[in-house]
Amino acid sequence: MVGLQPSEVPPTTVVKFLGAGTAACFADLLTFPLDTAKVRLQIQGENPGVQSVQYRGVLGTILTMVRTEGPRSPYSGLVAGLHRQMSFASIRIGLYDSVKQFYTPKGTDHSSVAIRILAGCTTGAMAVTCAQPTDVVKVRFQAMIRLGTGGERKYRGTMDAYRTIAREEGVRGLWKGTWPNITRNAIVNCAEMVTYDIIKEKLLDSHLFTDNFPCHFVSAFGAGFCATVVASPVDVVKTRYMNAPPGRYRSPLHCMLRMVAQEGPTAFYKGFMPSFLRLGSWNVMMFVTYEQLKRALMKVQVLRESPF
């Protein structure tokens, strides 16, 4: 690495792993209220006659939550969300390039679209398997108003939520919804990582952009839109199933069929706008931060290894 500029040094797997988790946490801090609004809109109508608060639109949902539950309510579940990103994004994003290289035949300069999709599915599934308990707790906190009676909080804190779910529903309760979540995140990871990878590659090959902020911004925005379109139906089913009390749904398929019967097919795109606003803005913030963090971390590494 001696004599190379930081931008010329390929980032190590450790740099990508740490950079992805840190960048994802930063993006979560800025976009978490949109994710909470998405969850509230997705579960609206799930249990007719019980819900007293009606949510309309992204901004309306956030304002209603602030008015009825307090100004901190849009950030309910943030701690679990940060737990999730450090374990989830680090794997699905940080290991993507390494897994892609593993699947690419030796002697091949470029990975095919099929190889990239396979790598995205692999890291997405690995990430869900490790991070599912954090996702369950995050969703429970975001949907807290619907649990219990009289607006009382069921969990005293994030660690108490892990313990309570394990005690009342068994350890399997912490992995509730794993299969729909694996499906959802395999789709999202493919849409995000593969789309970002391809758009960025085409922009650089066509010399429309250099490897800088505008290139990262356009690539990330396109990745966020594609991910929202293809993943929304699975995301709604995942949210409903993970938030449901024991016995409401026999399986994710039963949840999906009940949604169609009671609310129609448009239920699969409930919360689409906050999903897009969240995924679009989240992808832009995450990928831009991730690219800069990789460069900064490699610069530090080059300086440490330089003899001068």
Curated annotation (Swiss-Prot):
**Membrane spanning stretches:** 11-32, 74-96, 117-133, 180-196, 214-233, 268-290
Query: Where is it mostly found?
Result: mitochondrion
* Keywords per UniProt: Membrane, Mitochondrion, Mitochondrion inner membrane, Repeat, Transmembrane, Transmembrane helix, Transport
Q: Name one Pfam family in it.
A: Mito_carr
Which GO terms of the cellular component aspect does the record hold? mitochondrial inner membrane; mitochondrion
Q: Name one GO biological process term.
A: fatty acid metabolic process
What domain of life is recorded for the organism? Answer: Eukaryota
PROSITE patterns, alphabetically? SOLCAR
Q: How does it sit in the membrane?
A: Multi-pass membrane protein
* Record flagged with keyword Repeat: yes
Q: Which GO terms describe its molecular function?
A: oxidative phosphorylation uncoupler activity; proton transmembrane transporter activity
Q: Which InterPro entries match?
A: Mit_carrier, Mito_Metabolite_Transporter, Mitochondrial_sb/sol_carrier, Mt_carrier_dom_sf
UniProt subcellular location:
Mitochondrion inner membrane
| Mitochondrial intermembrane side of membrane | 1-10, 97-116, 197-213, 291-308
Residue spans, topological domain Mitochondrial matrix: 33-73, 134-179, 234-267
- Annotated region Purine nucleotide binding: where? 275-297
Stretches forming Solcar repeats: 11-102, 111-202, 211-296
Asked if the record carries the keyword Membrane, the reply is yes
Function per UniProt: Putative transmembrane transporter that plays a role in mitochondrial metabolism via an as yet unclear mechanism. Originally, this mitochondrial protein was thought to act as a proton transmembrane transporter from the mitochondrial intermembrane space into the matrix, causing proton leaks through the inner mitochondrial membrane, thereby uncoupling mitochondrial membrane potential generation from ATP synthesis.
Subunit comment? Interacts with HAX1; the interaction is direct and calcium-dependent.
What family is this protein classified in? Belongs to the mitochondrial carrier (TC 2.A.29) family.
Q: Which protein, by its recorded name, is this?
A: Putative mitochondrial transporter UCP3
Name the species this protein comes from.
Rattus norvegicus
- Point out the gene that encodes the protein: Ucp3
